[in-house]
From Swiss-Prot:
GO cellular component: autolysosome; autophagosome; autophagosome membrane; cytoplasmic vesicle; cytosol; endomembrane system; microtubule; organelle membrane
Family membership: Belongs to the ATG8 family.
Protein name (Swiss-Prot/TrEMBL): Microtubule-associated protein 1 light chain 3 alpha
Modified residues (Phosphoserine): 12
């Protein structure tokens, strides 16, 4: 079971940067993505892991399908995947494009998922 603390709080900035560098060297066609449950989410389960290596040709709709399957959601359950806790991106957008635009300074691409698209901002 993953920790309740966000990934950024569990690992130092230097460790995260080093890990991304190793991942990109060993898997140049994979995007390092951290996917965590939105902190206020109550309905959706917690993923069994938070770190994913996503092939760079995958688009957002494929990633959503993968995450829905991992969460074992039924087709009627609402599910929203947000980049950097704020951006809903087009499902046809390749993950490589999103990575270039939205990656964190540590090199990971951060996403959160929730059952509602309104987050009280």
């Amino acid at each position: 079971m993953p920790s309740d603390r966000p990934f950024k709080q569990r690992r130092s900035f230097a460790d995260r940067c080093k890990e991304v560098q190793q991942i990109r060297e060993q898997h140049p066609s994979k995007i390092p993505v951290i996917i965590e449950r939105y902190k206020g989410e109550k309905q959706l389960p917690v993923l069994d892991k938070t770190k994913f290596l996503v092939p760079d040709h995958v688009n957002m709709s494929e990633l959503v399908k993968i995450i829905r399957r991992r969460l074992q959601l039924n087709p009627t359950q609402a599910f929203f995947l947000l980049v950097n806790q704020h951006s809903m991106v087009s499902v046809s957008t390749p993950i490589a494009d999103i990575y270039e635009q939205e990656k964190d300074e540590d090199g990971f691409l951060y996403m959160v998922y929730a059952s509602q698209e309104t987050f009280g901002f």
